């Protein structure tokens, strides 16, 4: 399986994602520039964290206009897996691939710590290697991770089981403690915590490895989940 790791000006977690796929999961990955226009030959797309375009205007607001994003939208609409982490989540909401928005943290400052999450739905391409209701520890590092959407959208997220992860405590003001959501089809996931920083026990936790193992399990089995 081959993963595309996107790189925007200001991305700073792309190497961590590459390491998680190549060195830990022993799969193939390649960096793909924001100037590229094709994702041919890739099985999954990973959009890393960082500060794309220095978060100018709004986190992800300029990145959504990069040439590669046209290909990402087409890739997602074709039902292929797309994972956006931290700034990647922000980019996905700006691009309209996920509902809602990421607002400044309620505390109005950057938060960098390890938090506890609960797996709300394990019937997705990204969570099938976790038990439903399991708690996992993942790092966060963001200033704008406060998930918000209108009441109708929030009701739809719950009704469609699109909430993949929640924080077990109120970390940043996110509605219903939402930490990660999928699109309605289930092939796009955005999450603020960093699973790629928790794939080796040596570094404190391997709880994030399940996200990548879940993607691989689905790709290799050819079985899709969550409404596909």
Curated annotation (Swiss-Prot):
It catalyses: N(2)-formyl-N(1)-(5-phospho-beta-D-ribosyl)glycinamide + L-glutamine + ATP + H2O = 2-formamido-N(1)-(5-O-phospho-beta-D-ribosyl)acetamidine + L-glutamate + ADP + phosphate + H(+); L-glutamine + H2O = L-glutamate + NH4(+). Its EC number is 6.3.5.3, 3.5.1.2. Its main location: cytoplasm. It is found in: Cytoplasm. GO terms for cellular component: cytoplasm. The keyword ATP-binding applies. Disulfide bonds: none annotated. Keywords: ATP-binding, Cytoplasm, Glutamine amidotransferase, Hydrolase, Ligase, Nucleotide-binding, Purine biosynthesis. PANTHER family: PHOSPHORIBOSYLFORMYLGLYCINAMIDINE SYNTHASE SUBUNIT PURQ (PTHR47552:SF1). HAMAP family: PurQ. This is Phosphoribosylformylglycinamidine synthase subunit PurQ. It comes from Latilactobacillus sakei subsp. sakei (strain 23K) (Lactobacillus sakei subsp. sakei).
């Amino acid at each position: 399986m081959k993963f595309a790791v996107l790189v925007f000006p200001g991305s700073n977690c792309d190497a961590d994602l590459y390491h998680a796929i190549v060195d830990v999961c022993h799969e193939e990955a390649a960096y793909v520039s924001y100037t590229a226009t094709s994702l041919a030959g890739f099985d999954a797309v990973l959009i890393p964290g960082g500060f794309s375009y220095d978060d100018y205007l709004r986190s992800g607001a300029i990145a959504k206009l990069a040439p590669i994003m046209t290909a990402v939208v087409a890739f997602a609409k074709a039902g292929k897996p797309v994972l956006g982490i931290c700034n990647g989540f922000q980019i996905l909401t700006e691009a309209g691939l996920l509902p809602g928005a990421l607002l400044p943290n309620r505390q109005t400052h950057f938060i960098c710590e390890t938090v506890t999450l609960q797996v709300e739905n394990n019937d997705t391409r990204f969570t099938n290697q976790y038990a439903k209701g399991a708690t996992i520890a993942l790092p966060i590092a963001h200033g704008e991770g406060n998930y918000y959407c209108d009441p109708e959208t929030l009701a739809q997220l719950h009704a469609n089981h699109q909430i993949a992860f929640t924080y077990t405590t109120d970390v940043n003001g996110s509605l219903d403690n939402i930490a990660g959501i999928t699109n309605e089809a289930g092939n796009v996931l955005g999450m603020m915590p960093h699973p790629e920083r928790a794939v080796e026990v040596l570094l404190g936790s391997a709880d994030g490895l399940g996200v990548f193992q879940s993607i691989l399990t689905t790709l290799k089995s050819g079985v899709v989940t969550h409404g596909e």
